């Protein structure tokens, strides 16, 4: 068996990635989220595949086809709610995974980090298009508002929006193409994940100390396979409690009303995992400025290696930057809350303050904190 595992061209790849992979001996549970994201992706692809067998991407029948899945298809309700809440679990794991990367300085593995940012954009695009497919009120108006943002691009904006819509409004053509893209993107994401892993295995994993761990590696299996399995059990338990007991808690009641272009919902808002970016978008009165801030809120992650001023990699032994980091986390939670609130006093000013704080902490305060710590610790 050992000979096959190490010699067979295909099994050898799996062996080097998941079995004999040299792994730091001290990585904590924060390193579980990579494998949990892989699990989420598999769950989403499988449930999505079964949903696609019964779904029709036509404005006249899309809403009723989703109702048909829930009422008439065997365990259709379960598949539908697993897919909807699976997206939420996916984003929870994603945010924790990125947060871990920021905390422990994993952004210094530049290829892996940039690949991760591309993956984040791809997953966000997939989730947005998936939200449009049930063709409820929030699906329709969310698609209208978000795609309309592209009209802020000078000269080509309006033409671009009409090209994406396939007409002069969000309609049948838009729904059909969104379904096509929503179906193909997870497979593209799977390919990008393999590239992400390829880059990661070039350098090896980071660890909680941020120090080089070449002298102290252990094989991935059985040590981390069993540790990941515990994470999988906890995730699945949380996931099934959410899906079976509170399936609609993260959704929007407006999406149980069929799409009506003549009736605008009182508060148009995206799913909870986009609310922080939506709050940043809304906090700028100018349309183009808002769109740029929205894109930059994610793209700012790509300049993190340039903003790293500390002589230490991780925040483990850096209390000042740690404080900044947790203020940033609190700020993101405030932005998420604001994104779901109506555009009125005092939410407008809170959103603007939180948006400025978000960029200021990353670009100004964390690099300054790093330099201060270098001086305190006399690390010239």
From Swiss-Prot:
Binds 2 heme b groups non-covalently. The keyword Ribosomal protein does not apply. The cytochrome bc1 complex contains 11 subunits: 3 respiratory subunits (MT-CYB, CYC1 and UQCRFS1), 2 core proteins (UQCRC1 and UQCRC2) and 6 low-molecular weight proteins (UQCRH/QCR6, UQCRB/QCR7, UQCRQ/QCR8, UQCR10/QCR9, UQCR11/QCR10 and a cleavage product of UQCRFS1). This cytochrome bc1 complex then forms a dimer. Its cofactor is heme b. One of its GO terms (biological process) is mitochondrial electron transport, ubiquinol to cytochrome c. This is Cytochrome b. GO terms for molecular function: metal ion binding; ubiquinol-cytochrome-c reductase activity. GO terms for cellular component: mitochondrial inner membrane; respiratory chain complex III. The gene is MT-CYB. Keywords: Electron transport, Heme, Iron, Membrane, Metal-binding, Mitochondrion, Mitochondrion inner membrane, Respiratory chain, Transmembrane, Transmembrane helix, Transport, Ubiquinone. It holds the Pfam family Cytochrome_B. Heme b b562 binds at residues 83, 182. Belongs to the cytochrome b family. It comes from Microtus majori (Major's pine vole). Heme 1 (or BL or b562) is low-potential and absorbs at about 562 nm, and heme 2 (or BH or b566) is high-potential and absorbs at about 566 nm. SUPFAM superfamilies: a domain/subunit of cytochrome bc1 complex (Ubiquinol-cytochrome c reductase), Transmembrane di-heme cytochromes. Heme b b566 binds at residues 97, 196. It is a multi-pass membrane protein. It is found in: Mitochondrion inner membrane. InterPro entries: Cyt_b/b6_C, Cyt_b/b6_C_sf, Cyt_b/b6_N, Cytb/b6-like_sf, Cytochrome_b, Cytochrome_b_C_euk/bac, Cytochrome_b_N_euk/bac, Di-haem_cyt_TM.
